[in-house]
C-alpha cells in the first residue's frame, strides 16, 4: 500500500513539478556531439552529419526533465566560445572520439584548458568516449588514464564509454544527466 501511495505521489509531482536543466556539449570536431543530441532527442542515428558551425541549441524532454542542450562546434575556431556557453550550466558534457587515438592528446589538452577557467569551477563534467563500436576504441579505464581525469579534483567527474550508432550506454548517460538536473547553477 505504501509503495502505491509513493508511486501516486511521484506521478502527481511529475505533473506539476517539472525539472529543467541546461548543459553544454563540447569536444573536438567529429567526436559525435550532434549525433548524440539527435540520438537522445529522437533515437535517430545518421552517418551523414554536417559539422556544427558555431552552435545549436535544442530542448529535449525526458520524463519530467527538460534538458536545454548547447551543442558547440568543435573546430579550432569555435573552441574559444566553449567557456562562454559553459558558464552557469548544470553540467558540461565533453565528447571524445574514443577510436581516434591521434586526437586524444589534443582532446585532453582542450578539456583541461577549459576546466582551468575560474568561471567554470565546480560544474560537474560527464566525459563520453563515443564510437566504442569501432575497432581499437578506448574503453572507460583507458579514457580515464589517457585524458588524465584523475587530476581533476575540483568537481564531480564521470566517464562513460558509449556508442551513438549502437545506442550503447545512452540510458546510463541520460540517468546521469537527469540526476544532475537538480545541480545548482551559479
From Swiss-Prot:
One biological process term in Gene Ontology: antigen processing and presentation of polysaccharide antigen via MHC class II
Consequence recorded when altering residue 130 to I: Loss of GTP/GDP-binding. Affects chromosome segregation
Modified residues (N-acetylmethionine): 1
Cross-link (Glycyl lysine isopeptide (Lys-Gly) (interchain with G-Cter in ubiquitin)): 141
CDD domains noted in UniProt: Arl10_like
Reactions this protein catalyses: GTP + H2O = GDP + phosphate + H(+)
Amino acids binding GTP: 29-35, 71-75, 130-133
Effect of residue 141 to R: Abolished ubiquitination by RNF167
PTM characteristics: Ubiquitinated at Lys-141 by RNF167, leading to its degradation.
GO cellular component, one term: lysosomal membrane
Impact noted for substituting residue 34 to N: Binds GDP, hence is inactive. Alters chromosome segregation. Decreases interaction with VPS41. Loss of lysosomal location. Loss of interaction with PLEKHM1. Loss of interaction with RUFY3 and RUFY4
Tissue and organ expression note: Ubiquitously expressed.
Family (UniProt): Belongs to the small GTPase superfamily. Arf family.
Subunit: Interacts with tubulin. Interacts with BORCS5; recruits ARL8B to lysosomes. Interacts with VPS41; the interaction mediates the recruitment of the HOPS complex to lysosomes. Interacts (GTP-bound form) with PLEKHM2 (via RUN domain); the interaction is required to recruit the motor protein kinesin-1 on lysosomes. Interacts (GTP-bound form) with PLEKHM1 (via RUN domain); the interaction is required for PLEKHM1 localization to lysosomes and for ARL8B function in delivery and degradation of endocytic and autophagic cargo in lysosomes. PLEKHM1 and PLEKHM2 compete for interaction with ARL8B.
Purpose: Small GTPase which cycles between active GTP-bound and inactive GDP-bound states. In its active state, binds to a variety of effector proteins playing a key role in the regulation of lysosomal positioning which is important for nutrient sensing, natural killer cell-mediated cytotoxicity and antigen presentation. Along with its effectors, orchestrates lysosomal transport and fusion. Localizes specifically to lysosomal membranes and mediates anterograde lysosomal motility by recruiting PLEKHM2, which in turn recruits the motor protein kinesin-1 on lysosomes. (Microbial infection) During Mycobacterium tuberculosis (Mtb) infection, is required for plasma membrane repair by controlling the exocytosis of lysosomes in macrophages. ARL8B secretion pathway is crucial to control the type of cell death of the M.tuberculosis-infected macrophages, distinguishing avirulent from virulent Mtb induced necrotic cell death.
UniProt-recorded name of the protein: ADP-ribosylation factor-like protein 8B
Species per Swiss-Prot/TrEMBL record: Homo sapiens (Human)
